[in-house]
Amino acid sequence: MGVFRFISISLAAVSAANAAQILSMPHAQTVPNSYIVMMKDDTSDDDFNHHQSWLQSTHTHNITRRATIQNAGMRHKYNFSKMKGYSGIFDEETIKDIAKDPKVMFVEPDTIISVHGKVEQSNVPSWGLARISNPQPGAGSYIYDSSAGEGITVYSVDTGVDVNHEDFEGRAIWGSNQVNDGDDRDGSGHGTHTSGTMVGKEFGIAKKAKLVAVKVLGNDGSGPTSGIVAGINWSVEHARQNGGTKKAVMNMSLGGSSSSALNRAAAQAVEQGMFLSVAAGNDNQDAQSSSPASEPSVCTVGSSAEDDSRSSFSNWGPAIDLFAPGSNIISARPGGGSQSMSGTSMAAPHVAGLAAYLMALEGISGGAVCDRLKELGTSSITDAGPGTPTNVLINNGGAKGGKPNPNPAPSPSPSPSQPSEPQQPTPSQPGQPGEPFPGEPQQPTPSQPGQPGEPFPGEPFPGEPFPGEPFPGESFPGESFPGESAPAPAPMPPSPQHPHTPYPGGDNFDFDGLWKKYFGGEHWRKMFSSFWN
């Protein structure tokens, strides 16, 4: 009995000494009792399964004793190739128990992430497309190679997308809803706008790329970090099973307080071959203080205005990789037609679209894409901001007279019905959320969301000529974004709430394995050398 007591006391002392850090987020808006748990890099699948089984038992025991939290339990499970973790609603005692597991790297409070854009007036001139294919501002045409991103898939990790919008021509599908609100549509308009800039026929850069909508933010433009990490994980797995991560681009026009969990998830996506374009933020401050913009491996994008100055709202600093048009950008809106929005949210999809364009044209992927964008860009930005290491504005190569433009497909010549610059589309009947397109039986619907491994809809798009008539002035009621005002949103029908389902549990920890890890000399070396890796 004495020996057992000694062992128990020793284990408790070692566990307390080596407990994972429970991070503090004093300046962030946190989700009550919601946490993200990240495991150490060397955690095996068996270790992770044992931890989940133990967690189920421990959590059930704690809740049975106290029963102070509603809807508690695991929400999301993350399983990248080199990063495992989960999120959920837990009481304080359960979180302390979780932190004692030597396989846990850190525990982070779940915080609120928001879009980086705002709705402004309609019918301003469209200039972003022309700017990225010409050496000087003020050009009137967008010149591009006819490959136009064909064979590349773009993941819109955002508020959802109106996949039925005419500008997507059947190349957009609904992928996943990590908000779990039962509302498979874009009730904000933000995700549809950013997607139009990336792949739209009229407004887009990569006009032949495919698009997958991954909803991680609600109709108010905000959502928890845990759901965004889940959206990244889903996108990586879907890309792996549908053409490969090296033919995939992810756009994240969102951000919030610095989050180790979100940065690690973004880094994992890049490590597995995806290109990530991330908005720098709209606070006119150092982007290093926000996530995922502060993650070094992503391509962090600041916003430029029509005169090549840094947009007054754009964040700056060492995290910035590139600038792209972000002020007064016209793109698609849910239900048909278009609207104008400003923000680094509008700049990031210019980079994502151009990345897809270059990946198709030059066969590059991953980190090489951001480097190539820097090579092709022009040193045009004035007042890039304190500590910003670059003043490069993106360009598709037309500004330097070489690649990528071996077989240009110029915008049509001006005529009374076919203007040379991209114009707003003629109004049409609003698409119904989730309604399948003709000839595309594989497209998921709200009641049948796409799953990783599901094939894309048919390759060719209809190719019908798009009317060149300018869209008459129409004011679109937009969403209100943090720190900014906008007209009241259009009324939306209520949607039911669907709570997350906890993952089931199983066996307890292996005591012999724990003993070896606690008292084996190799444990100490590994713990201190890998804690922050």
Swiss-Prot record:
Limits of the Peptidase S8 domain: 126-400
GO terms of molecular function: serine-type endopeptidase activity
A GO cellular-component term linked to this record: extracellular region
Protein name, per record: Subtilisin-like protease 1
Signal peptide: 1-19
Compositional bias annotation for Polar residues: 282-294, 378-394
Region (Disordered) location: 175-198, 282-312, 378-512
All residue ranges annotated as the Inhibitor I9 domain in the record: 34-115
Keywords, sorted A to Z: Glycoprotein, Hydrolase, Protease, Secreted, Serine protease, Signal, Virulence, Zymogen
Biased composition regions of type Low complexity, renumbered to the chain: 471-487
Keyword Secreted: yes
Cellular compartment(s): Secreted
S-S pairs: none
Family: Belongs to the peptidase S8 family.
Residue stretch(es) of the prosequence: 20-116
Gene: SUB1
Annotated active site: 158 (charge relay system), 190 (charge relay system), 345 (charge relay system)
Native source species: Arthroderma benhamiae (strain ATCC MYA-4681 / CBS 112371)
Bias (Pro residues): 405-470, 488-502
